[in-house]
Structures are given as C-alpha cells and as structure tokens.
Amino acid sequence: MARITVEDCLTKIPNRFQLVLAATYRARMLSQGHAPKVESKNKPGVTALREIAEGHVGLEMLRKVPV
C-alpha cells in the first residue's frame, strides 16, 4: 500500500489551509456514510487525502460548506 502524504495533495490544492479544510469536510462526509471515490480500507481522513491526491476531490468541497 502506498503511503499518502500532504505533499502529494499540495500539488492539487497548493494552499495548505484550503487543503486541510477540504480534507476535513470530505472526511466528515465519509464518516457520515457518503460513498468513497477511491478504493480504500483506511479511516475517513486518509481516504479523503487519497481522493484529493488522485484528483477526485478538490476545492469544490469548500463551495459545498454551509455558511
């Protein structure tokens, strides 16, 4: 299994603060029962980072956050 790092995700979302917000929101969605977009047996936080690194999820996650 390949290890996922934040550096892998920073190529997709260059701003580290936006990266954390997007990953957190996606991880919360996964823990509430949403279907993952990648094959993963990891915890929601790691799965969210994998989705970002592979380009399945991006900054659009921040547009879905209720104000």
UniProtKB/Swiss-Prot annotation:
Q: Which Gene3D superfamilies match?
A: 3.90.940.10
Q: Which SUPFAM superfamilies match?
A: RPB6/omega subunit-like
InterPro entries according to UniProt = DNA-dir_RNA_pol_omega, Pol_omega/Rpo6/RPB6, RPB6/omega-like_sf
Q: Which GO terms describe its molecular function?
A: DNA binding; DNA-directed RNA polymerase activity
Which keywords does UniProt give here? DNA-directed RNA polymerase, Nucleotidyltransferase, Transcription, Transferase
UniProt lists the family membership as follows: Belongs to the RNA polymerase subunit omega family.
State whether it acts alone or in a complex, and with which partners, per the record. The RNAP catalytic core consists of 2 alpha, 1 beta, 1 beta' and 1 omega subunit. When a sigma factor is associated with the core the holoenzyme is formed, which can initiate transcription.
Q: What is the protein named?
A: DNA-directed RNA polymerase subunit omega
Species of origin reads: Methylibium petroleiphilum (strain ATCC BAA-1232 / LMG 22953 / PM1)
